[in-house]
Amino acid sequence: AEEREQTAKITIGRGAKKRAAQLNGVDQPAASSLIGKFCAVVFSPDHLSLVKEGPSMRRKFLDAALCQRKPAYARLLSQYSRTLAQRNTLLKDISYHSELLETLEIWDEKLSGLGAAITIERKRYLERLSEAAGEIYDGISQGRERFAVRYDSGLLRDGGEEAGYRERLFSLLQNGRKEDLNAGFTTKGPHRDDLLVTVQEKSAREYGSQGQQRSCVLALKLAEAALLAEALGEKPVILLDDVMSELDASRQDYLLNKIQGWQVFITCCDPNSISGLSQGRTFYVENGAVSYTHLTLPTNSRV
């Protein structure tokens, strides 16, 4: 991490350039250029649906965590997304221009290389995340339940070495060509992968109680923070966005104990949800004005 103070600014507007980014007053080519400059782990009510929602939300969680650890991964992901979009466009165009079919192999080769690289990064990170989150879940459940998370990818189902992932994805794309042409989009690749979260070796999504699902998410987010701190050599900022009221008292206590000594920002609508805090500053918003005090909150304020 860079030790000198930096100022990042993102401007949201209208027109052709909807977002503009600056770092220390210098214009950046894209907002994505700021990735890795300010590292934070966000925990919001949306994340509580991480286990029970569809695969896209879990992929988004995984990719966001990896982008902060490795800004180069963000560029890899962007390249894959552009290549995927181009292949999908070609699949649709082929139905009207059959002579384009012979160009599909070029995109298969490019997509398989990028997809294999993404799969390797995700797989390696998930192995470490599962171990770290498992230890945290063990603490939340007081050793009563076993937690695990693993990467569910078409490239991994038959085993094999990482060196063979590119060739395997290329084969999947080739063999699935008819299906892709009928569908008009690419049906194989890391953009279709998922994370399988289990408690007691059963799917937390299908069989977990609401409490178990929330414990899983809490374990995953805290593990994300721990692994990011390890990679950076310093603790990232923790942002708890209106999530405290969604957790019961025991999970609130566990979360707050785990992040003692970290820089933490907590937003809430109910001041009572952070009444157990004994230190720090409280900022509150009233009629568009922001001020701060020391954990003495006005009623019905947004913190």
Ranges and model annotations:
Residues 242-243:
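Walker B catalytic acidic pair
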Residues 293-299:
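Conserved small/polar residues in nucleotide/adenosyl-binding loops
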Residues 97-237, 246-250, 254-257, 263, ...:
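Conserved NTPase motor "head" modules and their coupling/switch loops across ABC/AAA+ ATPases, GTPases
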Residues 33-36, 56-61, 82, 102, ...:
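Generic alpha-helical secondary structure signal
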Residues 62, 69-122:
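Long, non-coiled-coil amphipathic alpha-helical linker/lever segments
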Residues 1-57, 61-73, 130-138, 165, ...:
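Nucleotide-state sensing region of NTPase/ATPase domains
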